[in-house]
Amino acid sequence: MKAIYGALAGAIGLLACSAGALAQQNLDTFRIAIGGFGLWATEAPRLGQQAGIFKKHGINVEYYATAGAGESLQAVISGSADLSVGVGTTGVMGAFAKGAPVRIFGANFTGAGDLYWYARAESPLRSLKDATEKTVLGFSSNGSSSNTVAVALAEETGGKMKLLAAGDQASTFTQVMSGQIDLGWAAPPFGLKEIAEGKIRIVATGNDAPALRDQTVRVDIASLKVMTERKEALARYVKAYRETLDWMYADPRAIEMWAANIGVPVEYARKAAFDFQPKAARDFDTITGLDKLMEGAVRQKFLAAPLTQEQLSTLIQIVK
């Protein structure tokens, strides 16, 4: 009798596993490359997946980290990723102008107040006014939003500083602390602990470049193949994404989950989300400051000339 019950239990377990696998197979999967992995502004795919929001809409997301938004853009262009979130707008414009099969399907972040630049505590740099021709300021990768902001900050100093692609936040921090570069980029909560401990101090934020305050510096992108061949699934992804954004700012559990994901105290996570990345800056439907963004892209040589209205209409296709 025990053998019969054991066999029955095993069969039931096998059926449950099979049903779970079948349910997973019935979900539409999107592979997402994330440059600023772990940042609040790029955390919606992971949190929405963990909270079951995407599954509710028949979507499964597979996310992975890249060294920066530039690498994420290339992943979408090559087809190794379907989507990316938080990619520098000017970099996307430049790639599109060169014929890359990529489209913008939503805004990610407007303004630049969520990024800051820091120096070692013993550094003589206390503000951008202290920068010289020898000052090296780091950003993540070419075409990223930190690249756009770095250029704008350099312009505020009269073009004095040297700019360097320094990689992700951890790599940049190592370079600052070892003296390889003078100013490193970061987005909270990264660095808040070190600031509190007096190891580093903030020298500038994205808001020190006033021209960027009303510009949508980061966008969410999809491959042309996804936009044309998977419209219905992408619409469900966007519906789940919007629901996730609302939940992230309304439910305290979202902050707790994020803090656990990135291994920081909840108070640091809460400060990073609500002080540096308010929901107003996360309007998915509105991309602003395009003329200024294109001017910057031309100066940065991402664009040979501003995109035409027809080109912009082709590139930007907000999914409702």
Feature locations, PLM:
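Sec/Tat signal peptide C-region and signal peptidase I cleavage site
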Residues: 17-23
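Short, solvent-exposed loop/beta-turn-alpha elements that line the ligand-binding surface or hinge
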Residues: 56, 208-213, 278-286
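Short, solvent-exposed mixed-charge patches
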Residues: 24, 228, 319-320
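Pocket-lining segment of extracytoplasmic ligand-binding domains
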Residues: 170-260
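Bacterial N-terminal signal peptides that target proteins for export
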Residues: 1-9
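Conserved C-terminal helix/tail region of periplasmic/extracytoplasmic solute-binding proteins
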Residues: 297-320
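Secondary-structure end/capping motifs
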Residues: 227-303
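Short, glycine-/small- and polar/acidic-enriched structural segments
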Residues: 24-159, 163-166, 175-178, 182-188, ...
